[in-house]
């Protein structure tokens, strides 16, 4: 085997090793210490949810729903107040047109629902905004009818009070049932009192501070429904008598029939007044204290009044028991215990989080909320209540358990907390990885099936299984482009060579267009990074789309057997025109850290942490600054991420980076370009090669190798060093071989042979390759000619003995030094001129010393030279003839050869 072939085989053996080493280098690697982040939401939220309303019959109520980004379309759901428990149903546009009580209008990111207040329209309403396959639901708005009615217990109730001057009189007018809460009007001697002269609350209590003789008279009240304007006059009356003369001293006490509120409810942020009723003479003074609310009485938010304690900007920590002491120096003092309950709207403290979940697995979603009264928690799965899902169970603490996650659960999962004061919601994006069915058991959606013959070997069936990628997640990049993200789970199926992206436009008429395939081949080994649990993510963009159109996308995987299989189809995606979209926050690249020779760490920030609610993640773009090629892309999930490591870079190279935030329906503008450099290679002496044990275990093709960058560089450098050593050895061996084949005493013979091409002829025994040898004619001294004749005679005798056995021989050519003989080169000659020269030599040898000759053929010894050297060749008539072909590329150095300069022609 020649040296060249050995070297080629060596390279072939080394190439797979180098390829495997290079493939083991991770392309993208997550940050070593990432900050904990919640699962990404859909990137959209309800900015303005419909509000609960109380209206009189026949009025028109408008519910308004506004989203942060324009959805694909709006829907409204309704649950009648007559159904227990309430069951929501969607209000279709067709039914809304037929029903004159309901009208639905949409305008970009705002939807309005107009409802005529009637008994059949009372209930709860929700707004549902659809963003492709995601349904984001608003909080519930209640529609109630205004009403007011009196309490029969207070009928014909009259009070007669005699009070000393200077006291504060608190009179409770009566109790009414009103929705909404009524406003109160008081009358003194049947004349309405101005509001500024009275102090009252929503419970119908009249406060008359520092009464005097002028305060004596008859008092009554009227309750008015603020929504309908209906007035209700209560029959209760107060006959108050304030003597002008002084009365006897009395201890503080309650008047006959006077009420004391021992429990007060107030909302956080409002101003509350705790009343301390009681009269005496002299008028008593109130002293306040609280055993379980330290510092609540004497602070900048409280004010002690003669008739009560006023607390402004109420906070939950103000809740507790308050004690009022009425004392005028006469024992016993009057004591009241009042419990203050601070009500608060619900607020979710711990929203649910969800990651990629395999179909059939068990999942628990947690949701913790606060509020007063204690909020009730319920769940919606893509707008549908979890109560009607057989796989869902809500435990007493409010958490939701999905015993077996199904594909229908994929989408937006929302947790709602509500009480009498309001409602609050939070959600998360739930992604479901469907089960991989064996070949032949699909649902008919996969068109790329393997054409291999079925086999009974289970092992072989697993090896030929083609595991498809996941359905792509779609994000808007511009008016004409989207970004697709998909993943491949670790498996034992066939290796994937590359991906193709397919998309299809959906028309309003429902007519489907054919699938379009992009031109780009997305290699399996490019643009990937690990997201944990053996999942490899991929990213690609699709351009040339039409705005305000709906599309579906899917990923086609091409495997090592040149067969293909497609992923599940994405949900319907509506490509919204950018002018109608609210801009997302643009991340700011703060620093690019030189992490290693092949990796850098990006650090960025947002202008406000509140922008995280609209963001699902970030796209990182990078390329060498000296290149104008396409940017490489990386996907960073999680709005709370603030750093990310990008590896597999060139050592000591400057790169340019830019970031872009994205949500489910849009992407932000690019951040400003920022350059960063990887660490330069460290200058060190060449270490001695160290042999390491090689693990021959072949990993799965979908398995990621997380190698240290220093180890990766060492392996690559060692491989290059081995290649350099082999190349040097090859060059040295080839040089020695060339020296052995070209002796120094025949420097021009090879050049002469290159100028002639032999013609193969058929031998009686076997085909032979004919060689032509042309030797220079001796034109030098007689001594040199005689020495040459002796050498030729010896060669002739040796080869003549071999001729009888071989049937063919090739005479060793006689070589003369052309420079010594004075030749400058060879002249171009045809085969006929060669034969004439040969015959001339023969006649010269036969004629002895006849004639003068320039070639010294008349010298003694010429005849013997011709007979001994040339005649055996000329007389070998039984040998096949030689035909000499002249090459068209005869070099110029042979153009000086004359017809008389040839000594012999070997045939």
Curated annotation (Swiss-Prot):
Domain (Fibronectin type-III): residue spans on this chain: 468-578, 586-681
Q: Which residues bind heparin?
A: 504, 511, 513, 552
- For the Ig-like C2-type domain, which residue ranges apply? 42-149, 152-233, 252-340, 346-433
What GO biological process term is on the record, naming one? Answer: smoothened signaling pathway
Record region (Disordered): 427-474, 676-701, 780-805, 829-881
Instruction: Extract the SUPFAM superfamilies matched here.
Output: Fibronectin type III (SSF49265), Immunoglobulin (SSF48726)
Q: Does the keyword Nucleotide-binding apply?
A: no
Main localization is membrane
Residues in the Cytoplasmic compartment per record: 731-907
InterPro entries hit by this protein: FN3_dom, FN3_sf, Ig-like_dom, Ig-like_dom_sf, Ig-like_fold, Ig_sub, Ig_sub2
What protein is this chain from?
Interference hedgehog
Q: Which organism is it from?
A: Drosophila virilis (Fruit fly)
